Amino acid sequence: MAKVLVLYYSMYGHIETMARAVAEGASKVDGAEVVVKRVPETMSPQLFEKAGGKTQTAPVATPQELANYDAIIFGTPTRFGNMSGQMRTFLDQTGGLWASGALYGKLASVFSSTGTGGGQEQTITSTWTTLAHHGMVIVPIGYAAQELFDVSQVRGGTPYGATTIAGGDGSRQPSQEELSIARYQGEYVAGLAVKLNG
């Protein structure tokens, strides 16, 4: 049984929705055990509420437990072309895992969201840098998801990983096409994890 973790940070719920779709896709793979968790919030409850943050029910992960999984699919909103501060803070606590090589050879993939589309690819590839330092095997999705060829509407999605465009005010929710790409990413990564570890 290959263990797959979908690990995310979501303030307004866009990445949470994408994470559910990623997990749904991963769960289609026989031999994959899929877990969804989120990183801890670093804002105070008062500031989080004032900023309009969405309460979420996924359990909170600890950095040390990452070593228990064969594949980790990370989800983060874009903050100036980088991962969110909450995800950065979480990954900055993985020094012990790095020192012991605990994540070496494990699969890693990334999905993201942006307000207007700017930075979606940069966020994924800049997150890869941290994962590469851990010796993780980075898994992009390429152009296998047919929705990536559809230019008839505004949508996220890159060969690097699934993305969604939330709109400048955050009112746009992930489209069916974006969720389909996210499901593909989950299924693809879980399938590889089973082949390598199942």
UniProtKB/Swiss-Prot annotation:
It is an enzyme of class 1 (oxidoreductase). It catalyses: a quinone + NADH + H(+) = a quinol + NAD(+); a quinone + NADPH + H(+) = a quinol + NADP(+). GO terms for cellular component: membrane. Substrate binds at W98. Its cofactor is FMN. Gene3D superfamilies: 3.40.50.360. GO terms for molecular function: flavin adenine dinucleotide binding; FMN binding; NAD binding; NADH:ubiquinone reductase (non-electrogenic) activity; NADP binding; NADPH dehydrogenase (quinone) activity. Keywords: Flavoprotein, FMN, NAD, NADP, Nucleotide-binding, Oxidoreductase. Its EC number is 1.6.5.2. Residues 4-189 form the Flavodoxin-like domain. NAD(+) binds at Y12. FMN binds at residues 10-15, 78-80, 113-118, 133. Belongs to the WrbA family. HAMAP family: NQOR. This is NAD(P)H dehydrogenase (quinone).
